[in-house]
């Protein structure tokens, strides 16, 4: 920064360079605001840099907690829209094993769709191509729009 730049007032000062702080700084900057981001250590070295990186579709909650499922997929779609460069499209699989009730699969798919979550029934052979380490005896598979987030991008 030049001397002139440091004497101009900032519109927004954000404390913390994790996902929330950096994302807020980016959003404010894109709106034309003058932003100062203050971080004690390095960007994403706190909780953000230690997360598992899973971008939930909300499918895991669809049958038992529709409200949480709806919130997850809405936030999933917002993140894909505003920070697509941070999201890796991985999809997720929900597998039905021989000891499971295959009829539950349709209940699961219906609940996902009611919550606004894309849920595609796929052939178990296709699921095994996607995830070769899965149990080869699966009798059903559903693909959902899970993803992975790189917190350092």
Regions found by a protein language model. Give the residues of each.
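Beta1/beta-strand and adjacent pyrophosphate-binding region of the FAD-binding site
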Residues: 4-20, 36
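Short, solvent-exposed loop/helix junctions and linker helices
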Residues: 9, 102, 148-152
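Short beta-strand/turn micro-motifs composed of small residues
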Residues: 16, 39, 96-97
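Glycine-rich FAD pyrophosphate-binding loop
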Residues: 29-50
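Short strand->helix junction
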Residues: 44, 62, 148-149
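Dinucleotide-binding Rossmann-like beta1-alpha1 core, especially the glycine-rich loop
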Residues: 52-126, 130
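Helix-loop-beta segment of a Rossmann-like dinucleotide-binding subdomain
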Residues: 86-94, 128-153
């Amino acid at each position: 920064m030049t001397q002139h730049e440091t004497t101009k007032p900032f519109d927004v000062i954000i404390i913390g360079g994790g996902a929330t702080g950096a994302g807020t700084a980016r959003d404010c900057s894109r709106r034309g605001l003058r932003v100062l981001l203050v971080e004690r250590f390095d960007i994403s070295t706190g909780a953000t840099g230690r997360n598992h990186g899973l971008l939930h579709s909300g499918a895991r909650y669809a049958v038992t907690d529709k409200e949480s499922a709806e919130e997850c997929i809405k936030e999933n779609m917002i993140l894909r829209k505003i920070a697509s460069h941070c999201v890796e499209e991985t999809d997720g699989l929900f597998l039905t094993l021989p000891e499971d009730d295959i009829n539950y699969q349709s209940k699961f798919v219906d609940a996902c769709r009611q919550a606004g979550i894309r849920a595609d029934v796929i052939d178990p052979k296709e699921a095994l191509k996607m995830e070769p380490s899965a149990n080869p005896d699966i009798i059903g598979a559903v693909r959902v729009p899970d993803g992975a987030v790189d917190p350092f991008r």
